[in-house]
Design a protein with these regions (language model features):
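Active-site hotspot residues in diverse enzymes, especially metal/ion-binding acidic/histidine motifs
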Residues: 1-171
Length: 171
């Protein structure tokens, strides 16, 4: 599933993007480590060994995102939620190359939370502005700024149209 389709299905029209709301609109359940621990009788230590931040899995045939609600800061939790959403929509929960899946999920999260075609049309000029606008970490914002300045990215008209009112108000 393409990011533009997720934005459309979740009616996402502005930044910052709420990845958990998008997941819910796609029928993907998001639960805390506390709930996972209680439902599956798994200790927090076992969950932390799996991942300090979060992970995704299939419950039957339904994708679930498990998030450590006490991990780090809000921006890191948002990126983790978007990363796990990526695993769900990119089909990674059915197996495959783990290293490749992690790279793809990281790329998905960056593209999903900070769409370059929207940032370009908003005329952003600094990593700090991207971080504030998209609710991402300073390091993630710096990477997005470098990618934006390179000019080598897909300018998706569907996404630009979806965010048109937001872009117009941003100026």
């Amino acid at each position: 599933m393409e990011i533009a389709e997720i934005y459309e299905r979740a009616d996402i029209r502005s930044l910052p993007i709420d990845p958990l709301s998008a997941a819910r609109s796609l029928g993907i359940k998001a639960v805390s480590y506390k709930i996972i621990s209680e439902c599956y009788q798994i200790t927090f230590e076992e969950l932390y060994r799996k991942s300090l931040w979060g992970f995704s899995f299939l419950e039957g045939e339904f994708p679930v995102i498990a998030l450590n609600e006490s991990a780090c800061c809000e921006r890191r939790r948002r990126f983790t939620a978007a990363h796990e959403l990526g695993h769900c929509v990119l089909g990674h929960l059915h197996g495959g190359n783990l290293e490749s899946a992690e790279r793809e999920a990281n790329r998905f999260a960056a593209d999903f939370l900070a769409p370059l075609c929207v940032l370009e049309r908003c005329g952003v000029s600094s990593a700090a502005e991207i971080g504030r606008l998209c609710g991402i970490s300073e390091s993630a914002a710096e990477i997005r700024l470098r990618e934006l300045r390179s000019g080598i990215f897909r300018r998706d008209e569907r996404i630009s149209e979806q965010f048109a009112r937001f872009i117009a108000r941003y100026f």
